[in-house]
Amino acid sequence: MYFEKITVKGEGKTDSVIEFRQGVNIVQGRSNTGKTAIIRCIDFALGSKKLPIDESFGYNEVELTIATPKGQVIINRLFHKGQVTVTTTIPDAENGVYDLKKTKNNKHPILSDLLLNTMGIDTPCEVIQNVDFKKQKLYIRTFLGMLMYIHTEIGREISIIEP
């Protein structure tokens, strides 16, 4: 599984698109050019409550395209919505509305379950949360930090990549 593309959309705005390739992708650049926004948009599409960018820019939707061995998954999430719309080519997977978290009253499938299943992880799945062996439900965002590495070295005056 890998992220193919992240798109930020807004009414009357030109889509802002970043495409990725399979393997390691490095997002680098000067300060205040949107690197952190890319990571926040991916996190938001997968369930973060925090808006990925300031609404004053005129954008209000994030679309994340994911390639999996079983097919493609396209996740659309509007700002201030606790659900996503999924379009997928994965056989036996549902297109339509997905909830972001498991609750007692879910009416829709859970996004994380779809993504974990495409990775070969049966759901529901629990993992150990702490030294007392308390368990918690496994979500895709549980290990998002292993899929995306964010490196910040704010004090560095000279870029290690650019001359």
Regions of interest found by a model, annotated:
Residues 1-75:
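Extreme N-terminal "head/tail" segments of very large remodeling/mechanoenzyme assemblies
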Residues 79-163:
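Extended, charged alpha-helical "arm/stalk" segments used for dimerization and assembly
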